[in-house]
Regions:
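Collagenous Gly-X-Y triple-helix signature in extracellular proteins
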Residues: 1-316
Length: 316
């Protein structure tokens, strides 16, 4: 199981002398696209250069004070900002120590010493409207197969007003797991999620705007990570989730292990992204064209990031 974490402010922006910024950030930039799943969970997003960029957490307190209520984030424009720990619309962009990963991974691209690899899987991009209608029809008819796997998010309604937040009691805001059932259709896996009125008009990657109570089908797809082997860093290429409070308790002194969002990643996310089916295919056929396994995934990645298709390469 991966020990998922977030980058620090210094990793992303460097120190006061603008030194020590990670090479992976220097070369790939600070802006980050939010997945449709994250947007459906309340992720903020800004349309920049035709892409929906979201804000994402660092693990660094604003001032390093134990009574500090705020954490540094990277906003949708890729600049440093800070926000109180109870807000839920900032997204999670996990990272991990790449040197500790022992399982096989897929390299799909390498440029300027930065690799793009595939490892793990998670609900990410919305299915187009026509196919969504077919899935919804099968769902209502009860003929979609449940795989037995579920993905966990927070069911607590996002509070973005400080006065409302101050009037809540602990039970109103503590993490309350919400399970998203995974279904399979023709060998492809999906989850179903209904649009929230609170996030109405959110722009999705297929051009639709979110409508309240409308069902959306999200495809479970391989996770793309940016890797810098010398720095031993793997960083998710996209914002994977949102809607989870950074820390409920008063004060944050940079002890990231004690935050609500770290506990969420340890207890749920790190377990639910673990690899399954495709690793067996890689071991059996190391020369297979990547399109033969992930045709739809690569198509979507091309649309979102104009990624060039390459051959699979076993890295480990």
């Amino acid at each position: 199981m991966l020990d998922l974490t977030f980058l620090t402010k210094e990793d992303v922006f460097g120190n006061r002398y603008f030194c020590n910024k990670l090479d992976i950030i220097k070369k790939c930039g600070t802006k980050c696209v939010a997945t449709d799943f994250a947007r459906l969970l309340g992720q903020d997003h800004y349309l920049i250069d035709g892409k929906s960029m979201g804000s994402w957490w660092t693990q660094t307190a604003k001032n390093g004070d134990q009574y500090n209520y705020s954490v540094n984030i990277v906003d949708g424009n890729g600049t440093i900002y800070w926000i109180d720990t109870y807000y839920r619309y900032v997204g999670g962009r996990p990272s991990f120590d790449y040197s500790l990963l022992k399982e096989p991974v897929i390299e799909i691209k390498e440029e300027n010493d930065i690799k793009e690899i595939i490892y793990g899987e998670y609900p990410q991009w919305v299915v187009d409207e026509n196919y969504s209608s077919k899935l919804e029809s099968k769902y209502k008819s009860g003929i979609l197969k449940e795989t037995g796997k579920k993905y966990t998010t927070d069911s607590v309604v996002i509070i973005d007003d400080e006065e409302l937040f101050d009037g809540l009691v602990e039970g109103d805001i503590i993490f309350q797991p919400r399970k998203h059932i995974e279904y399979e259709d023709d060998g492809i896996r999906y989850i179903r999620i209904e649009g929230s009125k609170k996030f109405e008009n959110t722009l999705l990657s297929d051009g639709r705007h979110l409508r309240a109570n409308e069902p959306y089908w999200i495809k479970v797809e391989p996770i793309v990570w940016l890797v810098h082997e010398k720095e031993c860093i793997a960083l998710s290429k996209y914002i994977l989730f949102s809607g989870v409070m950074f820390r409920q308790a008063i004060g944050y002194n940079n002890n990231f292990k004690n935050t609500d969002i770290k506990q969420f990643m340890d207890e749920y996310l790190s377990k639910e992204i673990e690899c399954r089916v495709y690793n067996e295919k890689l071991i059996e056929n190391k020369q297979v064209d990547i399109d033969s396994i992930f045709e739809d995934t690569i198509k979507r990645m091309n649309e979102i990031n104009e990624m060039e298709k390459t051959k699979i390469k076993i890295l480990k």
